[in-house]
């Protein structure tokens, strides 16, 4: 792994946030870099991400997730399915702690080493708006239903919906983070579900396509 140059990474993050028109506080910037440092440290043993270069991690992890956060502005209870190393859930939690302090983010993954990492991040960064669960989402009975369920690089859209629809509140929506526009996946959605919007995202310094897919129940 390349050296973790905190000042340089901070400059890159601050500029990227500015390009996204996000007004992040100094405390939020510090927590995001702290999170990245934890990921880089744990990644050598736990293989949380294939991205090893901290500069690329700022772009492909932090800015990639930050580009999506405004879509969650009206959410109260969010579930991040297949949370992995914490994307977008941890980034969303750091942003929401100041921007939307009423928001709560639950994160679920089947892999214990990943939820152990998320639990450590929650503790070290004092993220009181985060809950972490180790379970299969299709078998999980949550303490409450969620108005937004999200995922990043988790599964085909049809599987994503089928496995977690019992957890979505009435009137809730899915927000899936995808690369290229998933036209084939959209066409394969199960009956009773519709795509409300596919929104292209521009991620600073990333030369790749990113899209948000908004899915909701079909109104009869």
Swiss-Prot record:
What's the name of its gene? rsmG
Pull one GO CC term from this UniProt entry.
cytosol
Pfam families referenced in this protein's UniProt entry, alphabetically: GidB (PF02527)
Q: What does this protein do?
A: Specifically methylates the N7 position of guanine in position 527 of 16S rRNA.
CDD domains per the UniProt record, alphabetical: AdoMet_MTases
- This chain's protein is named Ribosomal RNA small subunit methyltransferase G
Q: Which GO terms describe its molecular function?
A: rRNA (guanine-N7-)-methyltransferase activity
Q: Does the keyword S-adenosyl-L-methionine apply?
A: yes
Q: Catalyzes what?
A: guanosine(527) in 16S rRNA + S-adenosyl-L-methionine = N(7)-methylguanosine(527) in 16S rRNA + S-adenosyl-L-homocysteine
- Biological classification of the source: Bacteria, Pseudomonadati, Pseudomonadota, Betaproteobacteria, Burkholderiales
Subcellular location per UniProt equals: Cytoplasm
Q: Which family does it belong to?
A: Belongs to the methyltransferase superfamily. RNA methyltransferase RsmG family.
Species annotation: Janthinobacterium sp. (strain Marseille) (Minibacterium massiliensis)
Name the InterPro entries on file. rRNA_ssu_MeTfrase_G (IPR003682), SAM-dependent_MTases_sf (IPR029063)
Q: Which leading EC class covers this enzyme?
A: transferase
Q: Which residues bind S-adenosyl-L-methionine?
A: 82, 87, 137-138, 152
């Amino acid at each position: 792994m390349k050296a973790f140059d905190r000042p340089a990474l901070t400059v890159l993050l601050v500029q990227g946030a500015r390009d996204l028109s996000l007004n992040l506080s100094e405390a939020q910037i510090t927590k995001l870099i702290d999170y990245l440092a934890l990921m880089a440290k744990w990644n050598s043993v736990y293989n949380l991400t294939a991205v090893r270069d901290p500069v690329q991690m700022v772009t492909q992890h932090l800015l990639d997730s930050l580009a999506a956060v405004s879509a969650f502005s009206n959410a109260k209870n969010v579930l991040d399915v297949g949370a992995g190393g914490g994307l977008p859930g941890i980034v969303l939690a750091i942003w929401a702690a100041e921007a939307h302090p009423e928001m709560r983010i639950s994160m679920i993954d089947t892999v214990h080493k990943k939820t152990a990492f998320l639990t450590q991040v929650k503790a070290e960064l004092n993220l009181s708006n985060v809950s972490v669960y180790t379970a299969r989402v299709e078998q999980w009975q949550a303490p409450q239903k969620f108005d937004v369920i999200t995922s990043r690089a988790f599964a085909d859209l049809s599987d994503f919906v089928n496995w977690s629809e019992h957890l979505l509140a009435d009137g809730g929506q899915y927000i899936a983070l995808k690369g290229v526009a998933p036209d084939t996946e959209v066409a394969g959605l199960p009956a009773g579900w519709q795509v409300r919007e596919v929104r292209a995202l521009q991620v600073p310094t990333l030369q790749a396509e990113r899209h948000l897919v908004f899915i909701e129940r079909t109104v009869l």
